Amino acid sequence: VCHSMAHKLGAYHHLPHGVANALLICHVMRFNAAEVPAKMGTFSQYQYPHTLERYAECAHFCGVCGKDDAETLELFIQKIEQLKEAVGIKKTIKDYGVDEQYFLETLDQMVEDAFDDQCTGCNPRYPLLSEIKEMYLKAYYGE
């Protein structure tokens, strides 16, 4: 869903695709890691939520370890945020000069378009429209 949302963020607000993905990735990782998602992904290999476990495995490969998978994920996200800062990625969509009024005017259509994007169906957790909207708002304003 990160890629789907980044497609629309770039299309509506002219942000480079890599920047759009970077602005969204940590919000999407937290969303995907929910142990009790509202709706699972559509592919059969996702019989139960295991995204948190997979993120923790990725973190371990990068030398990041916490006392459990949830702490490991948060430490991993901190490392990703540090990397983003080191390469000059700003903290929020707003920091890139995206006008707040225009962002809010386009938000509902971006949400719908991201939901319908071909990449969304591959996400391990299938998002509700309200959940996509919440992630966009977090990425715009910061948490």
Residue ranges and their predicted role:
Residues 102-143:
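Short, amphipathic C-terminal "tail helix"
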Residues 1, 5, 20-24, 54, ...:
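Residue-level detector of well-ordered alpha-helical segments, enriched
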Residues 4-5, 71, 94-97, 124-130:
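Short coil/turn segments at secondary-structure boundaries
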Residues 1-21, 116-122:
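Glycine-rich phosphate/pyrophosphate-binding beta-alpha loops
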Residues 5, 25-29, 80, 84, ...:
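Short alpha-helical scaffolding segments that buttress acidic/His motifs in well-ordered protein cores
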Residues 15, 19-102:
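Gly/Pro-rich interdomain helix-loop hinge
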